[in-house]
């Protein structure tokens, strides 16, 4: 391990949690740190964000300095690739030397691995910085209605927002029911990603919350009867909206970045995003004009937490725990909250921090391209993962040529 004098403030902070721990827990964590030294942690994560990749590069430098852990990001196009890999290794009897140590995961992918018993843990409560997490938030205790139970550790939150260019449109719909009328007045100026992409399904699920006769049914595993009743108003609503979408609703962008490119190119004026800071970051990078604004629908929008999980057969579990713990450190969370990094709210309970730690967050500046913090406080829980699967399948049957 490098000498403490060579550590940055963030790296030192990753170790200070030991001071506040009970002796037995401190001894256990010290053992984790010892085993982690020299380990190479392979972190499978969606690699479609330059901001995320840059942030993980910063995290890599910090855990190398504080704990002699080498973090290697393995970029994925879809987290399902990691799930498939772990399942394949289980089938092949590769139970002790898996190729994945840590996964950025949530929702259906977490549910799939947890259901099969393919996750290591529970481990989250063993992390010193876990005591700082804002456990009062439902989206941190439940992942798409599935109890987390310590098998994954949160590191950031996200919420569905809508981004528009105020230079071209002054008023945007703040209620799902108003989208068809708005689209009729602005034909071709709104779209959302295809439903094979999580953002496309999220937009439809947001509409379901507003239109279903009983939104509470979305918190339970889907049944054929419940699906038919809940989605009947959705299909009627979409029939009104579709003709006025970009390219008449016959084509959809493949992903969030592809959708944003349409906004950059002036092909659309309004789009959904699951990252409240994405527009602000794009403005600062010179990719979107300063006239861009971000809004949240009245009554709240879907929100969730991003987690990291450790496969049952990870070869470097101790190193993976060190990385997960560092992601929860006040220094790492404050860095993630900066627009030059990721932006967005922390998963920490600020009341659990010291005055010096809270100051890291209070120094953050609110930009006009982000929604006001108060608008992000009303978070709707994600539906049970089975709804997304059924919704995507029904969509493809109805609208795929």
Give the ranges of each region predicted by the language model.
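N-terminal signal peptide c-region/cleavage motif recognized by signal peptidases
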Residues: 21-23
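Short, polar/charged alpha-helical segment
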Residues: 29-37, 44-70, 162
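Extracytoplasmic ligand-binding site segments that recognize negatively charged/polar headgroups
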Residues: 46-58, 74-81, 96, 100-257
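Hydrophobic residues within well-ordered alpha-helices
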Residues: 86, 113, 259-264, 310
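A ligand-binding cleft/hinge motif common to bilobed small-molecule-binding domains
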Residues: 110-112, 270-289
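Periplasmic-binding protein-like
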Residues: 144, 158, 238-241, 276, ...
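Conserved C-terminal helix/tail region of periplasmic/extracytoplasmic solute-binding proteins
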Residues: 261, 368-401
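Mature extracytoplasmic/periplasmic domains
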Residues: 301, 306-375
């Amino acid at each position: 391990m490098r000498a403490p004098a060579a550590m940055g403030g963030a790296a030192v902070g990753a170790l200070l949690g030991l001071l506040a721990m009970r002796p037995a827990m401190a001894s256990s964590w010290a053992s984790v740190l010892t085993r982690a030294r020299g380990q190479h942690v392979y972190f499978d994560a969606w690699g479609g964000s330059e901001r995320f990749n840059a942030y993980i590069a910063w995290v890599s430098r910090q855990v190398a300095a504080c704990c002699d852990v080498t973090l290697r990001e393995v970029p994925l196009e879809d987290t399902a690739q990691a799930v498939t890999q772990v399942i394949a290794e289980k089938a092949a009897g590769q139970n002790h030397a898996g190729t994945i140590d840590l996964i950025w995961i949530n929702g259906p992918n977490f549910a799939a691995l947890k259901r099969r018993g393919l996750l290591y843990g529970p481990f989250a409560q063993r992390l010193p910085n876990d005591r700082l997490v804002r456990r009062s938030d439902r989206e941190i205790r439940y992942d798409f209605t599935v109890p987390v139970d310590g098998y994954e550790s949160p590191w950031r939150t996200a919420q569905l927002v809508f981004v528009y260019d105020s230079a071209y449109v002054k008023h945007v719909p703040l209620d799902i029911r108003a989208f068809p009328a708005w689209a009729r007045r602005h034909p071709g100026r709104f779209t959302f990603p295809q439903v094979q992409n999580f953002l496309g399904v999220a937009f439809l699920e947001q509409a379901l919350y507003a239109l279903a006769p009983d939104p509470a049914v979305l918190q339970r595993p889907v049944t054929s009867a419940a699906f038919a009743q809940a989605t009947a108003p959705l299909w009627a609503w979409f029939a009104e909206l579709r003709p006025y979408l970009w390219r008449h609703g016959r084509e959809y962008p493949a992903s969030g970045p592809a959708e944003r490119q349409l906004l950059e190119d002036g092909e659309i004026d309004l789009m959904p995003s699951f990252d409240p800071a994405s527009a602000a970051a794009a403005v600062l990078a010179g990719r979107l004009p300063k006239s861009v604004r971000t809004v949240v629908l009245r009554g709240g929008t879907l929100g969730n937490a991003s987690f990291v999980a450790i496969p049952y057969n990870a070869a470097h579990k101790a190193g993976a725990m060190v990385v997960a713990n560092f992601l929860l450190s006040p220094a790492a969370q404050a860095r993630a909250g900066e627009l030059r990094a990721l932006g967005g709210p922390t998963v920490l309970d600020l009341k659990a921090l010291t005055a010096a730690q809270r100051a890291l967050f209070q120094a953050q500046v609110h930009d006009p391209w982000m929604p006001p913090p108060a608008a992000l406080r009303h978070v709707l829980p994600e539906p049970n993962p089975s709804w997304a699967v059924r919704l995507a399948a029904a969509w493809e049957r109805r609208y795929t040529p």
